[in-house]
């Protein structure tokens, strides 16, 4: 993560340098700032407000599905990580450790949590005794630490914010139902609120969460064609239950291990929002998630200000009363400067009122997604705003899906064809995107594809647009149809 401190005058076009465009946008929109600690960023108010909107939407859904919030310690004893072999091997390189406290060396190192299965497993073992204690349905909103070598704001940082759900169940069936239920909660939220289309499916064994039996993911395509894993849901089986002795007496008075799940999304979703919808003018936020849905700007010479505000203020109040997140920009800047500023910040809808509009008893509405300018009678303005916000939300999803589908390739069947596709895209500047291909199930084939192309398996989709018959790598019969892509 190059820590660029200078003010961004102009946003680099996406077609010129997508990575530079991304940094320019988040800096110019004032979403974050860098700190002296590598990979640790400040979420400035405009950036944190996006996370608050995501939190609010997901938290509501979690509570509707019976989950409650709790908070567990950030410091985790080293010995806890030894209780689940795969888990410690998966996270060990990324763990930051606390070795001293109070001026003395600690008897046991404490990890800054990379995820909380271990500490939560330890506590569940104290709390769960009987089938009457089940299920346990808990979510935690927290910060976590993974010492990343290559960092990028919001997408890959050493410290990030997330939620992690942890549940315990009496049976495998119940736990698997929970795993899929929460995957669907994520899919619904990201597609309906964030307007981001997803490929939903199961991770291959080499890509699953360390310590899980099965991992499922939602995968999104960014505007540079790369994949972003937007959320995961894990069926952990009894792996952590056995490691932490989480047992219960069932109805027949038999002592059994629980079945557990975990599931999470993080501030990566902010990065996804920017990279899926943003353009060369800056951010473009879907109305349901935008902190400000409508920006109102008075225009015209100062001598007409009272005349304009006599119509401006009542409309502002009416929109606020209707539940629209509306803001008025009354600063001493030119209207043109304000238009560009709020377009760059991604506000879905702009309303302009000038002296001529007052004479005509109308206002001018301008859509961020299409740039369309729509004159609207003032007495219809509130209803039109509500309708336009829904239309913008739908249109942003449709545009993102059309882009994704246009760059999802279904006719590449061999490793040679994949290499040729990548080479052609690099030569022409086209987007390589996602490739749907067959896979025999051999981890060596999956690893070879990654090594030779940097394309990784994203997931085995539940509903693939086609079924592949032969393995992309070895040509043997395919056991799975898999999405491959380069990824963040």
From Swiss-Prot:
Keywords: Aminoacyl-tRNA synthetase, ATP-binding, Cytoplasm, Ligase, Nucleotide-binding, Protein biosynthesis
EC number per UniProt: 6.1.1.15
Name of this chain's protein: Proline--tRNA ligase
Domain remarks: Consists of three domains: the N-terminal catalytic domain, the anticodon-binding domain and the C-terminal extension.
Signal peptide feature range: none
Location in or out of the cell: Cytoplasm
Any single Pfam family the record assigns to this protein: ProRS-C_1
InterPro entries: aa-tRNA-synt_IIb, aa-tRNA-synth_II, aa-tRNA-synth_II/BPL/LPL, Anticodon-bd, Anticodon-bd_dom_sf, Pro-tRNA-ligase_IIa, Pro-tRNA-ligase_IIa_arc-type, Pro-tRNA_ligase_II_C
NCBIfam families hit by this protein: proS_fam_I (TIGR00408)
SMART domains: ProRS-C_1
Gene Ontology cellular component list: aminoacyl-tRNA synthetase multienzyme complex; cytoplasm
Subunit-structure text: Homodimer.
BP term (GO), one: prolyl-tRNA aminoacylation
Protein family (similarity comment): Belongs to the class-II aminoacyl-tRNA synthetase family. ProS type 3 subfamily.
Gene Ontology molecular-function annotations: ATP binding; catalytic activity, acting on a protein; proline-tRNA ligase activity; transferase activity
Role: Catalyzes the attachment of proline to tRNA(Pro) in a two-step reaction: proline is first activated by ATP to form Pro-AMP and then transferred to the acceptor end of tRNA(Pro).
